[in-house]
Every structure is written in C-alpha cells, then in structure tokens.
Amino acid sequence: MRIVFGGSFDPVHVGHIILARDVCEHFNAKEVIFVPTYQAPLKEKHKASAQDRLNMLKLALEREEKFTIEDYEIRRKGISYTVYTLKYLKEKYGGEELYLLLGSDSFLKFHKWKEPREILKLAKIIVVEREGMLEKVKEYIKEYFPELRKNEDIFFYKGRRIDISSTE
C-alpha cells in the first residue's frame, strides 16, 4: 500500500513530516507519496511558487527513505484535481492499493471536490482526527457518504497532537 499525501506545502513543515512518518508506520505502508498542488481548487493562491514549494519539499524529505515526491500536479499546471492525480498514480503503480491522507478539516469539504465518488473508487481514505472533530466527521459521513465502511473504505488515525495547520 502507498499513502498519497497531497497539499500545498506552503511551506512544508515538521508537522507534515511527523504526521507522514507516524501514518506510514501505523499503516505499515510501502511509502508516502507527497503530491504538491499546483493550484488547489478550494484554496487561495499560494505564497510561494510551485517550483519553490517543490524545491522546499525536496530539501525537507531528502533523508526520508519511505517518502517520495510526485510532481504530476505541478507538471500538469492549472487547477489540481485529486481524481486525475489518483488515476495517474494507479496507472504508474500498476493498480497498487492507494490510501489518500486527509485532515479532518479537508475531509469535511470532500463532497465539494471534483468527482468524490470516483476518488473513493481509486483510493481508500485515511482521515487524521483533529481534537473534537470525530463526531462532526461521523455526521458528515452519514449525510454525504453513507456507503463508506469504517476500516474498509475509510480509516481514522488519531496521532500525536501537532499544533500546526496550513489552513489556520
């Protein structure tokens, strides 16, 4: 299994790295694939350029054996849609099982993403629980994605508390 960790990484920080290490170990993943966005559809424009964010990511991850960087979205340019990236990665890795890593705040907007149900066919979801968000996430699933089965289609990960968020 490979874990896909998409984000703006503007900038990449120790919280991203600690989370990726912890999730990789917890799920016994082959690797964590960092996918920096070119431009996220639901976020403001980035402060750093795509190339600068990619370079920062390369520097931050250079000593991490189980981490790779996929620059597909940056090479593709334009608005980055996860569904296209997952299709690309499925082809690249021969259909190997993919798990999409999402913070609970991002997951609560998942119904607004391009082709969310297609994404669910391409990857299983790992939701990183934020303090006090689990009930909200469970209600959200009941409302928007009642077909998701815990520990089959969607997994919840409660790791160490790291008080760093790119959305705050």
UniProtKB/Swiss-Prot annotation:
In short, the EC number is: 2.7.7.18
> Which keywords does the record carry?
ATP-binding, NAD, Nucleotide-binding, Nucleotidyltransferase, Pyridine nucleotide biosynthesis, Transferase
Q: Which GO terms describe its biological process?
A: NAD biosynthetic process
Record carries keyword Cytoplasm: no
UniProt GO molecular function = ATP binding; nicotinamide-nucleotide adenylyltransferase activity; nicotinate-nucleotide adenylyltransferase activity
Which Pfam families has this protein been placed in? CTP_transf_like
Instruction: Extract the InterPro entries matched here.
Output: Cyt_trans-like, NadD/NMNAT, Rossmann-like_a/b/a_fold
Q: In which pathway does it act?
A: Cofactor biosynthesis; NAD(+) biosynthesis; deamido-NAD(+) from nicotinate D-ribonucleotide: step 1/1
Q: NAD: is it a keyword of this entry?
A: yes
Q: Which SUPFAM superfamilies does UniProt cross-reference here? A: Nucleotidylyl transferase
Q: Which reaction does it catalyse?
A: nicotinate beta-D-ribonucleotide + ATP + H(+) = deamido-NAD(+) + diphosphate
Q: Which family does it belong to?
A: Belongs to the NadD family.
Q: In UniProt terms, what function does this protein have? A: Catalyzes the reversible adenylation of nicotinate mononucleotide (NaMN) to nicotinic acid adenine dinucleotide (NaAD).
Name of protein? Probable nicotinate-nucleotide adenylyltransferase
